[in-house]
């Protein structure tokens, strides 16, 4: 049922996955179980979401029920930027692996390129509320992550929220052992990322779209922010296909060969979000949706925009 995108490692990454950012404890376990039953095989996780232990319980239960085998699942997690120092990479990774109750990850990503001050505080800020940078860079972290691949603990590495300049920096790193297989970025019709997708694809790097529905439940949403799910043109296209706005927004990525990870903890929506393989948007509809771009970001983490590796000062 699920279709895949082939990575540069020849591994197959399911093109639709379940996002777990902002999925609350007490709900995320059930969400993952519902997703696996609905045919999802790709689950997107992260250390900073602080819910990996519940995701892990759900995966374990489904494996024990023989509903799915580990090798059929594609599990992604991310290294948070307070852990860029080599020994800390290992520590953070081991906690993720233990919480997820797995013996390996399919892909391990660098969550953001800008390093934060090391320590227990995941969001180290100064008295003005600005993020405090760290000494280690994403290049330091990458070397430690490559060791995890050598040890069979991770199948492949990737990045998230990287601009093409940062990917370039990584690809040009002397002694680079493993290239990133994906760049996970915010992407939806108001932020179509055409140049970045073109660049990544030209380098053999897939793109994974987070917040494909425009992250309507983000805690910092303002009433005047645009709403994709309520966009009349999206709703019009959806009605034509007898689909929902969310299904159109997800299908839009699939047709660009972009992996997409909608988040939901509502069982009916989790099921709905993967029922996207039985219709096709026309070239005209795709062009219309692409024309909505306004470079609007739901997630711009402005409190770290002064740091050297902040990604969004670049055009793409």
UniProtKB/Swiss-Prot annotation:
The lineage of its organism: Eukaryota, Metazoa, Chordata, Craniata, Vertebrata. Retinaldehyde reductase activity is inhibited by tolrestat. It is found in: Lysosome; Secreted. CDD domains: AKR_AKR1B1-19. Keywords: Acetylation, Lipid metabolism, Lysosome, NADP, Oxidoreductase, Secreted. Found in many tissues. Highly expressed in small intestine, colon and adrenal gland. Belongs to the aldo/keto reductase family. It holds the Pfam family Aldo_ket_red. It comes from Homo sapiens. One of its GO terms (biological process) is retinoid metabolic process. Changing residue 301 to L: Reduced catalytic activity towards all-trans-retinaldehyde. Induction: Overexpressed in certain types of cancers, including hepatocellular carcinoma and lung cancer associated with tobacco smoking. This is Aldo-keto reductase family 1 member B10. Pathway: Cofactor metabolism; retinol metabolism. It is an enzyme of class 1 (oxidoreductase). It catalyses: all-trans-retinol + NADP(+) = all-trans-retinal + NADPH + H(+); 9-cis-retinol + NADP(+) = 9-cis-retinal + NADPH + H(+); 13-cis-retinol + NADP(+) = 13-cis-retinal + NADPH + H(+); allyl alcohol + NADP(+) = acrolein + NADPH + H(+). The active site is at 49 (proton donor). The record marks 78 as: Lowers pKa of active site Tyr. The keyword Zinc does not apply. Substrate binds at residue 111. Gene3D superfamilies: NADP-dependent oxidoreductase domain. GO terms for cellular component: cytosol; extracellular region; lysosome; mitochondrion.
